[in-house]
Design a protein with these regions (language model features):
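Structured, solvent-exposed acidic/aromatic patches
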Residues: 36-40, 72-324
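Terminal processing/anchoring signals of secreted or surface-associated proteins
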Residues: 1, 19-21, 130, 168
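Sec-dependent signal peptide recognition
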Residues: 2-9
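Membrane-proximal, proline-rich intrinsically disordered regions
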Residues: 4, 19-70, 89, 97-100, ...
Length: 324
């Protein structure tokens, strides 16, 4: 009996060890191990997480709230946005994507870059991090920041927007102080092949944008003046170009949402708003155009009569059929 118990104990021990070893192999073979993570691997992923949210949900809601967009005749997908409403249900997926993917990845990139003194990559990650926080604070007011990256804290506190702005600007200043124009930057899609000089310009632009938004409630005039005087900003558009194509899985986020027929839908919801059309095109009493902003034709298409006619916020009435 003792012999049997001894054998059983050995067998049980082997089984337990075997199970432990078996469970240890449950690592996604298509994902690199955490120990093998590099900034070159993580940076493009963080960018695409940002592009897919900012370029879709936040672009669309922001466009409606700013009265750039109105709703197409007879459709209802975004009528709530057109009425200046944004429910938690509608924004939950994108909000989670920014927090749990983009910001988390960018924070890890910052840590890796700082450990290796890769100050170009450090600045690039801090710049995108600042861009995201500026957008989220402007959209929600309060979001997790000071406790956001503590993995042991499942319920981080929501910081005040003013505190987040101050913290993010301080992070950006620190990164700018460490980076030099010739520093290398990890593989990325936004400014591919560029050294930190291009990212310094983008960081200055993001900083100016944040200070401008702060200027109504804080005295930041001297900081704005210093940035403007230095005049070290991007000379042209900074956009994700060359990474989209007219193929399933490679479409730009906004095009995929509104214009692609890949999902079997031909419905278009987003059209021009009368507010932006009236701002970019002025007519006299006879209806003749006396001024037209050159960007109008780049933003919108005229109706079948060659006229730009905007729709009214909060509606999807028949007038919306006259514009695009």
């Amino acid at each position: 009996m003792k012999k049997f118990a001894f054998i059983f104990t050995i067998a049980l021990g082997m089984l337990t060890t075997s199970c432990d070893s078996y469970l240890d192999i449950n690592q996604d073979p298509n994902s690199p191990a955490e120990a093998n993570m590099t900034t070159d691997i993580m940076f493009p992923a963080a960018e695409m997480n940002l592009a897919s949210t900012y370029g879709d949900f936040y672009r669309i809601t922001g466009g409606y709230f700013a009265q750039y967009y109105s709703h197409a005749f007879g459709t209802s997908n975004y009528v709530d946005y057109s009425q200046f409403k944004m429910s938690a249900t509608r924004s939950s997926t994108d909000y989670t994507q920014l927090n749990q993917r983009s910001l988390k990845n960018l924070n890890t990139i910052c840590q890796l870059a700082e450990n290796d003194e890769e100050w170009g990559t450090f600045l690039a990650a801090k710049t995108l991090k600042a861009f995201i926080y500026q957008m989220m604070v402007d959209a929600y007011g309060e979001v997790p920041y000071s406790e956001a990256f503590d993995a042991s804290n499942a319920t981080p506190k929501y910081d005040q927007g003013a505190d987040i702005y101050a913290g993010v600007l301080a992070e950006l200043d620190e990164a700018l102080s460490k980076a030099s124009a010739g520093d290398k930057v990890a593989t990325n899609f936004l400014l591919p092949g560029k050294n930190a000089g291009a990212w310094i310009q983008l960081a200055n632009a993001v900083k100016l944008k944040m200070l401008t938004r702060e200027s109504g409630v804080a005295d930041v005039n001297s900081q704005i003046a210093a940035l403007v005087s230095a005049n070290n900003f991007p000379a042209g558009d900074v956009a994700w170009e060359g990474c989209w194509s007219n193929e399933s899985g490679s479409l730009s986020p906004f095009y995929a949402e509104e214009f692609s027929t890949a999902w079997g839908s031909t419905q278009i919801n987003v059209v021009a708003n009368i507010a932006i059309v009236g701002t970019m095109q002025q007519k006299n009493a006879e209806g003749d155009v006396i001024f037209e902003d050159g960007r109008l034709a780049a933003f919108f298409e005229p109706n079948s009569s060659g006229v730009y006619t905007g729709g009214i916020s909060g509606s999807n009435f028949s007038t919306s059929d006259n514009y695009k």
